[in-house]
């Protein structure tokens, strides 16, 4: 069932969350434990992240190095299939421009089609660690809109080389990302909203936000996009604050602000345990306010914060 239909199928604010595929060489059991921990809150869908390959240089000796391509977290498609089959919960794999050619994407879509996984989250993805700006893969894409167009063509029965596909089963549906505090590479919010509108016009059925800690910014963002004629669900993305080190790390890494009230309270914490309790309390307050204002769904980012998300969900669901 499409994500938008899953959201509409409940009278209450829907619950969903995101997980990462396991590191290369490790098993899937830890992911099962995460799902088992959060399953009691009736997740309508589970997102599975995709991670681009990175180039690393291995020393060969005599001053020579060999450049190799490595992916630390492969297995997105397999994890999506395993979770959907084990739990009968809709899974939403991420589809990236970053690190993928058009042909790579086509093979992923074919695998997903065979498996009956038809919900996607379409993203440009991050730049490579060694790059100062985003560089697309050879024969790849610069923008999520281009990726949407390939998915649309696939749904219509056209391969990237123009040859026909025998389309069977349910066509792909997809959402996209948005940022209530502006994408770091966009000069202003007006342009950010312009590109979001283009992504919706290309076929995205909903948008899920980057994490935020200030509900005011989310509400203002939704008001602005509605004025621009964007009427799809804008799903808030939430991650509990849980460590003292995150006071500086979160703004630096994710280019988002921490409200002064949260930052001031965090600076009073003496231990990570105190910070985690504060983060849970803050997140519960955030979620209750969002629910009171009628958000269709709350999407949680529980990486390294599964127990915190569980405590928040217990309080609000």
Please name every model-derived segment:
Residues 125, 138-171, 176-185, 223, ...:
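Active-site pocket-lining/capping segments in soluble small-molecule metabolic enzymes
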Residues 18, 46, 112, 199, ...:
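Conserved, mostly hydrophobic/aromatic
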Residues 41-74, 128-138, 204-220, 303-305:
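Glycine-rich, proline-tolerant flexible connector loops at the mouths of alpha/beta enzymes
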Residues 14-32, 90-103, 173-191, 267-281:
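Active-site mouth loops of central-metabolism enzymes
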Residues 101-114, 191-195, 220-223, 243-249, ...:
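Catalytic cores of alpha/beta
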Residues 102-149:
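Flexible, glycine-rich active-site loops centered on histidine and acidic residues
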Residues 1-44, 48:
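Conserved N-terminal beta1-alpha1 strand-loop-helix module at the mouth
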């Amino acid at each position: 069932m499409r994500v938008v239909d899953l959201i509409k199928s409940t009278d209450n604010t829907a619950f969903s969350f995101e997980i990462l595929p396991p590191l290369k060489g490790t098993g899937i059991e830890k992911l099962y434990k995460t799902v088992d921990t959060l399953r009691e809150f009736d997740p309508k869908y589970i997102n599975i992240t995709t991670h681009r390959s990175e180039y690393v240089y291995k020393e060969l000796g005599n001053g020579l190095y060999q450049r190799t391509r490595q992916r630390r977290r492969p297995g997105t498609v397999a994890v999506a299939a395993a979770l959907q089959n084990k739990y009968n919960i809709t899974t939403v794999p991420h589809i990236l421009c970053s690190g993928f050619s058009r042909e790579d994407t086509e093979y992923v879509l074919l695998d997903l089609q065979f498996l009956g996984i038809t919900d996607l989250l379409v993203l440009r993805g991050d730049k490579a660690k060694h790059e100062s700006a985003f560089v697309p893969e050879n024969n790849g894409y610069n923008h999520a809109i281009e990726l949407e167009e390939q998915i649309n063509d696939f749904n219509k029965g056209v391969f990237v080389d123009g040859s026909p596909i025998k389309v069977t089963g349910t066509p792909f549906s997809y959402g996209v990302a948005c940022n209530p505090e502006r994408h770091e590479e966009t000069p202003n919010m007006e342009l950010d909203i312009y590109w979001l509108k283009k992504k919706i016009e290309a076929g995205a059925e909903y948008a899920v936000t980057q994490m935020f800690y200030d509900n005011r910014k989310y509400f203002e963002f939704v008001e602005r996009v509605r004025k621009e004629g964007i009427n799809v669900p804008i799903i808030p993305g939430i991650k509990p604050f849980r460590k003292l080190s995150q006071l500086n790390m979160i703004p630096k890494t994710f280019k988002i602000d921490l409200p002064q009230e949260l930052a001031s309270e965090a600076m009073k914490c003496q231990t990570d345990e105190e910070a985690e309790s504060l983060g849970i309390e803050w997140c519960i307050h955030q979620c209750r306010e969002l629910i009171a204002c009628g958000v269709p769904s709350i999407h949680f980012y529980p990486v390294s914060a599964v127990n915190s998300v569980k405590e928040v969900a217990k309080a609000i669901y």
